[in-house]
Every structure is written in C-alpha cells, then in structure tokens.
Amino acid sequence: MSLSLYNTLHRRSEPFEPLEANLVRMYCCGITVYDYCHLGHARTCLIWDVVRRYLQWSGYEVHYIQNFTDIDDKILNRARAEKSSMGAIAEKFIEAYFEDMEALHIQPADEYPRATHSLDGIQKLIHDLEQRGFAYASQGDVYYAVRKFDGYGKLSGRKLDDMQAGASGRVNEDPDAPKKHDPFDFALWKAAKAGEPAWDSPWGAGRPGWHIECSAMVRDRLGETIDIHVGGSDLIFPHHENEIAQSEAATGQPLAKYWLHNGMVKVEGEKMSKSLGNFITIRELLKKYDPMAVRLFILQAHYTKPLDFTDEALTAATKGWETLNDALLFGAEHLDTNNITADKGILAKFKAIVDNDLNFSGGLAILFELAKELKKEKNILVHEGKLQQNPQILASLWLTLKELADILGFVPETKQQAAGLTDAEIEDLIQQRKDARANKNYAEGDRLRDLLAEKGIVLVDKPGGITEWHRE
C-alpha cells in the first residue's frame, strides 16, 4: 500500500504522488507573533513535524517552510499596551516560539520567512494581480476582486451567493466597505496609519494584508506549485481560500497539489483560542507534564479530528509515555545490538497503518505492543537475573521500537536524567532493599524505598517477593 492523504481541496483521500520524484515541497502557515503559543499551536506544529519525519523516513527529501506573521493589528496592540515596538514584540515571541518548539522536540523548519523580510515578493505579487485585473487600488489600499476569480470557494465549499445572503450586517460594520467594489473583496495592501509602521510601495506607504504574505512566501521560496500546504482547520476559510485565489490568479497554476488540515484542540467542546480565554500556554503545560507525554497525547488522536484537552487525558498520556520510556531505556542498557537490525515485518506493518492518511494514532499501538514485550522481559531479568527470550530477538524488537519512536519524535531518558539513576542502579537499590528486608532490617529497607521515592521511582511490592517499579 502506498501513502494516501485526505485532500481538503477534493474532500477525499488520494494517493500521494509528489510533483518531483523523491522531493516534497511543504509549507505550513505559522503563528502571528504577539503572544506565547498555546496547546492548539503545539498540536499544529507537532503534527506537521511528525508528517515531515515520516516522509523523510519513507525516503523523501522534504523542503519545509513555516512563516512568521510579524505585521498585524494584534502585534501593534500588544506593542501599545507594553509601550514597546512592533519589532520588539515580534522578536520576543519568535524567541519564545523557538524555546517552546525545542522543549517539544520539534525539528526546525528549513526556513522561517517573515512578512517584514518578504516585502519585495509581496509587492511583486500584488503588482502581478493588478496587471491581470484581479486587484485594484482604492484610497491608498489595494483590494483583491474576489468575484473575478471563478474558483473562489473551491477549498472551503462556500459559495459567494450563499454567503451574501447573511452578510448585510457585517458589511455595515466594515469600516473599509466604502473603499471596496464588492463587500467580499479583501485587502492586499493597507494604507499607512498614523503611529504605525509603514513601508513604501507603488500605491503609497502602508503594510501588507495577512493573506498575501503566505502566497508571496510560497512563490518566492518553493515555487508556483508546491506538493503539500498544511495548517489548522480554522485557516481553511478565509485564509487558505484567499491564498488560492491570490496565487492561482497570479500564476495560472495550482498553488498546492494537496491541502492537509489538522483538527482543533477543544476545551469543553469549544476551540481552544486566545480570543475565548480558554487556552493553556505550552510553557505552562510543560511545568506540569513531560514534553513527551504531551507529544503522545497529541498523537493519540487522528490529526484531522478534534482533540479534547483534559488533565485526565494528559495524566493517562504520562503513564503511556512511562511505558514507552522504560522500554526504550531497558533496551539501551541491557541489550547488545551489534550486528542486529530492526524487524522489517513490524516496520512494514507500521508503514501500512500510517500510509492510510497518516494514521499515527493507529501506528502507536505497535509501539505499545513492543514496549509491553520488553517490559515483561525487564521484569524477568530483575527477578530471575536472566532473559527469557533470545537476546538477539529482543535486541531486534528494541531496535524496531527505537526506530518507530524516532519517526514519531519521542526522545527517551528525560526522566532518567532527571532522576539521576540508570535502570541498573535502580535495580541494584531494589535488590539491596530486598536483602535488608530478608535480614529483617526494615529500617534500611524503608530508607532505600524513601531514597528511590525522592528520585521519582515508585515501588510496587507484589506477592511472591516480586517488586515492580516505574518512574513518576
């Protein structure tokens, strides 16, 4: 089975065939840098990070671009509130973004173009649209003439006539309505306002509109047509719809062959967003939960579906990550992998699952099956001092788990390093405790148990003198 992707543009799953063999050009709409990123942003960035990793593992070279919107009313409002500048606010939150992404082990994009660094390309694209009759200047602004583009609405499935029926109230509230030829036209360039940053242009000083930024960055860095355009489902309309209208009107070519959209993170049934005030920032979340537990939580739901945020779900993901982490550490410390390879059959099974529209949630089941088998052997080794299965078979299973964990971006040892104890050291202390209790030195046994507890190691005494352990 080959990779298939659900293409929002055609509302169906389609075989993935890149425009150029073994090369994938991929663009993600990035953040507007006026505040710290929240869990919704984490989901978007993490999902496309794993998609990129999977494509690379599948043999593709991936050229991945993600932009920063660093010109926006929200940034200007934040700058006024903090008595700062738009540039200073943007730099502050771009730096915070990179810190958050590093904490979540999200690979950097190949490029991070900014709107303020892309003005030549933006103005060139606006000029091209004007020359082709799709844009017009009006009182220092430049607008896109939506009705001139016959394909408008093909991504979102919306029709202008249907939208017009309920738009009268919104039109009356639009302060730019007198400048527009049609209520649905949108700004490509905004005339300068007093006290706001502005750049020279053929239409007068001003700044670009939001939608034109991405169209220009895609064309300048990846070409007229790319393989995959991704983003959150909240961007389908109007942002991605408007990107298509701009780019395809200017070039006469499709903007992207595949449009992929991730579902929203929800809190009590509503989208997590700053405007609703129901969000938790990534840095707040990571004070409470391991980054790898957050990664597991996000990957447990199919990328197209909504993801419900609860503390209970994150707690369950934490326990799941402990299982995977323990298995990864066990193999690293106890198994000899010289001249051993991963199990090709299991890797093929994983690929067959994930190739069905990036079903990472289904693929996770294979990782847990492997972790369960390795954990069983770990407990046998602790209590009997030897492995039950053939060590070479176990080493192959562990290498398979490690390879799959790498694809999904899981990094072991975080908790091990925090505890400062290796598995072998923990098992040695458990044995010392057993010996102390066997000699009726219960005070020493309690001391060792407390020592392990301080290091985040929980002991579970079971019948028959068996002691199991896990990290908190």
UniProtKB/Swiss-Prot annotation:
Listed InterPro entries: Cys-tRNA-ligase, Cys-tRNA-synt_Ia_DALR, Cys-tRNA/MSH_ligase, CysS_C, Rossmann-like_a/b/a_fold, tRNA-synt_1_cat_dom, tRNAsynth_Ia_anticodon-bd
Ranges spanned by the short sequence motif 'KMSKS' region, renumbered to the chain: 271-275
Gene3D superfamilies, sorted: Cysteine-tRNA ligase, C-terminal anti-codon recognition domain, HUPs
Main localization of the protein described in the UniProt heading: cytoplasm
Any one of the GO CC terms: cytosol
GO BP, one annotated term: cysteinyl-tRNA aminoacylation
Motif ('HIGH' region): 31-41
Gene Ontology molecular functions: ATP binding; cysteine-tRNA ligase activity; zinc ion binding
Binding sites annotated in the UniProt record for Zn(2+): C29, C214, H239, E243
Binding site for ATP: K274
Catalytic activity line of the entry: tRNA(Cys) + L-cysteine + ATP = L-cysteinyl-tRNA(Cys) + AMP + diphosphate
Assembly and interaction partners: Monomer.
NCBIfam families: cysS
Family recorded in the similarity comment: Belongs to the class-I aminoacyl-tRNA synthetase family.
Name this polypeptide is given: Cysteine--tRNA ligase
Organism, as annotated: Picosynechococcus sp. (strain ATCC 27264 / PCC 7002 / PR-6) (Agmenellum quadruplicatum)
